[in-house]
């Protein structure tokens, strides 16, 4: 695990974005941890979040021309990632996002920002069922652009209804790489370094054993 990944986990814990305990997920599973990126909700949070996304993006080595943030949660993520790439990595990258409702006046349409073209890096908070990715693929394809990859904050590395995860389904269906700032494996490594969190470590390991990919 790299330094920025450890820092991201601590950032998420401090903001209570990442919690350990017992949580019932939409799937009905009882999870030993919960991740709610919506709690990154201040200016400082967004500035730091952008740095972590930019770091993971540069670390991945994936070539891309434009950042796309699907409405709604992806919009501030794309924006802050673009700012961080410019400020900390000297990369002035165009960005774009969509509206849920088409605008009928002014410039019109469903897209805001730079023209949607070239190799697109889609940024979002998490992938649960892959629905937002599929909707975004229709938008990206309609503009003649191609998907370079997908970047999210956390990969839970757990099976969906099938034997593979929603992320693996996206990679299979769209022939792209999905990268994340951290994964469930990274959370386990972090917990292994914290003796005072041994109970949580045992619970997360058991969960991975049951639902992991």
Swiss-Prot record:
Question: Which domain of life does the protein's organism represent?
Answer: Bacteria
Annotated keywords: Glycosyltransferase, Magnesium, Pyrimidine biosynthesis, Transferase
Q: Which cofactor does it need?
A: Mg(2+)
A GO molecular-function descriptor: orotate phosphoribosyltransferase activity
Q: Which reaction does it catalyse?
A: orotidine 5'-phosphate + diphosphate = orotate + 5-phospho-alpha-D-ribose 1-diphosphate
InterPro entries given in the database record: OPRT (IPR023031), Or_phspho_trans_dom (IPR004467), PRibTrfase_dom (IPR000836), PRTase-like (IPR029057)
Q: Which residues bind 5-phospho-alpha-D-ribose 1-diphosphate?
A: 26, 72-73, 99-100, 103, 105, 124-132
Gene Ontology CC annotations of this record = cytoplasm
Q: Which residues form the signal peptide?
A: none
Role played: Catalyzes the transfer of a ribosyl phosphate group from 5-phosphoribose 1-diphosphate to orotate, leading to the formation of orotidine monophosphate (OMP).
Give the family from UniProt. Answer: Belongs to the purine/pyrimidine phosphoribosyltransferase family. PyrE subfamily.
NCBIfam families, per the entry: pyrE (TIGR00336)
What this protein is called in its record is Orotate phosphoribosyltransferase
Q: Which organism is it from?
A: Serratia proteamaculans (strain 568)
